[in-house]
A protein has these predicted regions:
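Alpha-helix N-cap/helix-start motif at helix boundaries, enriched for small hydrophobics
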Residues: 9-14, 128
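Conserved tyrosine-mediated DNA breakage-rejoining catalytic core shared by Y-recombinases
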Residues: 13-52
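Short, contiguous acidic/charged loop-to-helix segments that flank catalytic cores in large enzymes
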Residues: 32-39, 55-62, 102-107
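DNA/chromatin major-groove-contacting recognition/catalytic segments
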Residues: 40-43, 48-50, 130, 142-163
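Short, basic (Lys/Arg/His-rich) helix/loop patches that form interaction surfaces
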Residues: 56, 71-130
Length: 163
């Protein structure tokens, strides 16, 4: 998720057949996103990750079980700062604003959002949108919590020509 920016529903469907080496020698994963039908091919930047998971592909796990394990790992990693967030109250079936350790609030979707947020200032928005399957820039920017101020394009242009 955090390395390739895909939804958990797409990650759990990856098989060895999805992985290939491109013309420049980089490992790629060819994915047709379930939600949008978009075809994306993110790069696997960290070969160690693929070395660890490749032998076990396809690795079937439910989204719920993945999220449970993710919370356990984050707890072990001491990602426990108290944060405000909305959590479903199982009795009332409504979301409530609560203060909880951060690991309790995290889910697989945070990995995807972190991918987009972490690369936002390093990779052109159009490339990130392609990899995450977003069609509208306004939706993408809202997704990662960035507002598009009136100088956004001018600043991006200046940054690009100064590089």
């Amino acid at each position: 998720g955090v390395s390739i920016g895909q939804r958990i529903s797409d990650l759990i469907e990856i098989t060895k057949d999805n992985i290939r080496v491109n013309k420049d020698g980089y490992l790629m994963i060819d994915i047709v996103q379930k939600k949008t039908g978009s075809e994306v091919s993110p790069v696997i930047a960290d070969k160690e990750i693929i070395d660890q998971v490749y032998p076990d592909l396809p690795y079937k796990i439910s989204e719920q079980k993945f999220n449970k394990y993710m919370k356990m790992v984050c707890k072990e990693a001491l990602i426990d700062k108290i944060v405000k967030g909305y959590k479903m109250n199982n009795k009332t079936k409504r979301k409530e604003l609560v203060n909880l350790p951060k690991y309790e609030m995290l889910s697989s979707h945070d990995l995807r959002r972190s991918f987009a947020t972490n690369y936002f200032d390093k990779v052109p928005t159009s490339i990130l949108m392609n990899l995450t399957g977003h069609n509208k820039e306004s939706t993408f920017l809202e997704y990662i919590g960035k507002s598009q101020d009136k100088d956004y394009y001018a600043d991006a242009f200046i940054k690009a020509i100064q590089s």
